[in-house]
């Protein structure tokens, strides 16, 4: 089976490697154009491009696939490359470009998407972050037959995965990437045998995982302690939960719900203690112990190391975000 692969970040690279390892012929990879990244803002190729080129797979990087859009020459060149590839199917994973109908219609078996949620819950751009943030007990991967809607196509395979109390977006991402890679291999093997059975998504339970914005990073200490703990885990590694204390912004990377109680009249954001064990902060209904922190321009550090270079003390107050 000939497979065109469309994807950009590490989540997609894992699936591409799984398909290649399973012996599928991959004549073409589509990925986003190189972007400036890092402190030097040098152009950097996507994880998918780097892997594809290291395995001598042809790569196309159109800025758009819309023939009537802003970059019609890119779309036309991509169309020619897709036609020349004569693929049976296109696999899409976190690609980042909208696929017009002509793309969906071109492969014999259409386009299959690897989506990191249990559809129809968390359609959209940030399903892993939002599942943790919402306190979902489980998530998973859906292999979907793509249509013109936003993650609305028929479901082909679904696998569930429990969200652990310590999972961050980073750890859950890696688990779901591995699961998605295994599932897309299984889906294509079933497709080759004519054994895939599409199931329509239910109309009930639809939610949207809107893109994570940097403006969401700030911790609201008036919220319940469990909600703040989930927020920190959901914002790790991007954009990183943040707290303001005076003129300093501190990133919060790891936390635990403390067993200490918090009187209802205690000021929210008040530092109750700061020692090698962690920084305990009063929250809406309890106490959060922050165990890994980072100052602006510094490194992520365990609380003990962080406090050697940043003077946090009991009685200080983290700012509350503007309403």
UniProtKB/Swiss-Prot annotation:
It catalyses: L-methionyl-tRNA(fMet) + (6R)-10-formyltetrahydrofolate = N-formyl-L-methionyl-tRNA(fMet) + (6S)-5,6,7,8-tetrahydrofolate + H(+). GO terms for cellular component: cytosol. It comes from the Bacteria. It is an enzyme of class 2 (transferase). SUPFAM superfamilies: FMT C-terminal domain-like, Formyltransferase. Keywords: Protein biosynthesis, Transferase. GO terms for molecular function: methionyl-tRNA formyltransferase activity. Its EC number is 2.1.2.9. (6S)-5,6,7,8-tetrahydrofolate binds at residues 117-120. Pfam families: Formyl_trans_C (PF02911), Formyl_trans_N (PF00551). The keyword Cytoplasm does not apply. NCBIfam families: fmt. Belongs to the Fmt family. Attaches a formyl group to the free amino group of methionyl-tRNA(fMet). The formyl group appears to play a dual role in the initiator identity of N-formylmethionyl-tRNA by promoting its recognition by IF2 and preventing the misappropriation of this tRNA by the elongation apparatus. This is Methionyl-tRNA formyltransferase. It comes from Polaromonas naphthalenivorans (strain CJ2).
